[in-house]
Amino acid sequence: MTAPATNLMGTYLPAATFVRGRGSELFDDAGRRYLDFVSGLAVTSLGHAHPDVAEALCAQARTLWHVSNLYANELAPEVATTLDRLIGGGTAPAGGQVFFCNSGAEANECALKLARKWAGPGRHVVVSTWGSFHGRTLATLTATGQPAKHAPFEPLPEGFVHVPYDDLDAMAGALDGGDVAAVLVEPIQGEGGVVAPSSDYLPGLRRLCSERGVLLVCDEVQTGLGRTGRWFAFQAHHLRPDVVTVAKALGNGMPVGACWASAEVAAAFGPGDHATTFGGQPLAMSAARATLAVMERDDVCARARRAGERLAGALGSLPGVRSVRGKGLLLGAELERAAAAEVASSALGRGLLVNPVRADTVRLAPSLLVSDAEVDEGIALLGAAIGEVLAG
């Protein structure tokens, strides 16, 4: 047998090897500089190696890393209180409770279990949408509305139904059976192409769920914590979900996830119903506490709105870009032809990280602290890449 080139499983196709980061910049193993408009898939929202987060981690690492959830620590309740307030809009608490975990998939798994426990026997179905992405575990993969990702792992768990995104009539029909526990939805579909629904969609879902006694679960793993110009994307629609899942930006690169639920729904869980070894540990919570503190201090929501307007406007003026979708600093540039992978590759060669999320769409998710000069530099590099590819 021929020895593998690496002892890592072949689940990824890395395009570069990075060894250092600073703000919106990355440096590879040859010392070359790149401008990062991927942010680790909307994770490093404060940029790489943010000094406040780095200092918090170093200080905590000298004190206490981990004790398991057999015991309490001082940081987790504090971070939960901050999250609850931000879900309430930033000024007043939402009155819910938080379960900490390690990733977006784990946060969504928690939400799925909580929904089933809350709904009780006979009501176990979760309705999600085509084009969605909710994780890679078997349950969250099944909730994900992308059949190509399902095929290699069938048979999948039962109890999941998919309907078209932004279609209230289809959703109403799916809720008619009486066996539905929850609706799971992204306020903006990220992996599905940065697709924002019509303005009446989320309010319509809230109304349908309230009428049918079904939980509304908002997956804010990618859209949450300032990315779209609000603390959470659902807040643009003046509603309150029953459950909100959070991860990615919460630790600015440290693995941290969270599932928030209203007090009534959270009460369905009792001791032993759900658990995690690492979730909520002091080291991860120190990163989350520092990250949230910087986000509030530096008003990342306002910064995302302002920088997003600049970036979206410049994207829309680039030759070869048909349209720009998204909000704040979660944007998708739809190209005039299906060449997103080639454009991303050309951009990387020029020193810019973007990623293709559909055959014709490149996603941009820079740091929420990105400067005007960095936005302009990114646009110039992307424009050159698009011009090169579409001219070929």
Residue ranges, per PLM feature:
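Conserved N-terminal phosphate-binding loop of PLP-dependent enzymes in the Aspartate aminotransferase
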Residues: 1-392
